[in-house]
Structure formats: C-alpha cells, structure tokens
Amino acid sequence: ATLRLDLDGEPLELHRPALPRLIVLGAGEHAAALCRLGAAAGFAVTVCDDWALLVTRERFPDAAELVVAAPHEYLENLDSPDARTAVCVLTHDERLDVPALRTALRMPVGFVGAMGARATVARRAMLLRSAGVTDAELSRLHSPLGLDLGGATPEETALSVIAEIVASRNSASARPLRDGHGSVRRRDASSDSCAVRSA
C-alpha cells in the first residue's frame, strides 16, 4: 500500500509491505480464535468454509476476507500465493480437508498445517497418500498443528498455532529465549516495516 504524505512541504511516499496472509479453512470455534489472534499478530486473515451460516462478519469481525466455497476450490483459484502465505486446515472433515491439503501442499506457500488428534493425523496421512500426495509433499505438513504449550481453550490453541507459523517463517527453534545465547533479535525488523522515500 502507498500513502502520500506532506512533511515540511515536501511530498513523500510511504510504502507499507503487504501483510502476510493467513488462510483459515473451516469456520468453527477454533477458527474464530485463530482469526482473532492472527489479525492481532499482523496477518491478513481469510476464512473459508462451504457452510454460509458459519462464515459471517459477526463471527469473524477481524477477517480481511470471508469466503463461502469448498476449501480446495478456493485454494485452486487463490491469487498470488507466496512464501508469506500460511494455510491452516481446521475443517475436521476428511471429505474437505484431504482435497484441501492435497491442493495446499502443491502450492508455493510457506506453511501448511492441519488440526487433529494423532489418530486423525495418521489416518489423514494415509488418505493423502492414497490421493497421490508424495512423501516429499507430506513432509511439508505441520500436523498436529501448533506448538506444545499445554493449552486447551480455542484461544490457547490459536496462540500455539500462530507461534508455530512465526517460528517456521523465521526458521527459529521455538525454544525459550533463556535457553539460547546471543542477541534475542534474530532478524532485521525493517523487512516488515515501512519504507519512506521522496516522491
């Protein structure tokens, strides 16, 4: 986005990088919590579900985009997915999540995750392989989704998911900072900041 400013009579352009994208497939309670925390963490959140009764502005006031569609069909038509795009599958229905994951794992996105218990994860991996997903593609999948924070509520679960996405994006260990050495700032924050130049 570009914004023109006038500082001391001299026009400037303020260039703000586009927000990283978080695509949440499924519109249950965990999705609502993930949308809230994702938006607060600086993501442009899209929520997609094939059930229109769930995909409402009242339930997802912080979403940048609400989509009523089959998740895999939405992904197939996604505009400009890139390494700053994270896809999280929270549909809890293998008829939806298997085709969505098969599509997502073949896209140039930076993160693909799926919620589920370990038994669900194992069965889903079997179904994905049966659907033609290779072991190399399957190795990209973060599932069960989230870091082990010991939480139980949708909000605590969402926090663990956002933490895993950020750690993955930065190739970070996700260990406590007190167990590390050196600077706590691992990267140049200017990569996500605004750049100002004279017009």
What are the residue ranges of the model-derived segments?
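Segments forming oxygen-rich coordination pockets for charged ligands
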Residues: 1-67, 82-86, 126-127, 168, ...
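ADP-ribose/adenylate-binding Rossmann-like module
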Residues: 48-49, 86, 91-95, 101-128
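Short amphipathic alpha-helix with an adjacent loop that forms part of the alpha/beta core around
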Residues: 72-83
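Adenosine-phosphate binding glycine-rich loop
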Residues: 109, 115-199
